[in-house]
Amino acid sequence: MNIDKVFKALADPKRLSLLVRVAEERSPSTVSHLAKGSGVDLSVVSRHLAMLREAGVIKCEKHGKEVLYTLQTDVVVRTLRQLADALECCCAEKDL
């Protein structure tokens, strides 16, 4: 996992919103389901999902003709822990 890639993917508000939507679904979702009501074109949602997948925060599985997307909770949690640890080290050094 590349922490830089994760934060770069999450820096875009639409991708972050899409990640939250995937997390809220609690079950695998298709691109068309995730695009519904988002006001964003299906192809754009698909590109955003590809970037999130490349960053490792979501995974996709092909079932027949459909591709289903789910949150990689462990990756998100591990990334946030790495950030917290890095900040804790920085803050601890400043307190010395």
Spans of model-derived segments:
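Amphipathic alpha-helical dimerization/coiled-coil segments
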Residues: M1-I3, E24, Q72-L96
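N-terminal helix-turn-helix DNA-binding core of bacterial DNA-binding proteins
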Residues: N2-D41, H63-V75
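Short, hydrophobic-biased segments on the C-terminal half of alpha helices
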Residues: L49-A50
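Glycine-centered, phosphate/nucleic-acid-interacting loop/turn motifs that mediate DNA/RNA or nucleotide
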Residues: G56
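Short beta-strand "wing" residues that participate in macromolecule-binding interfaces
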Residues: C60
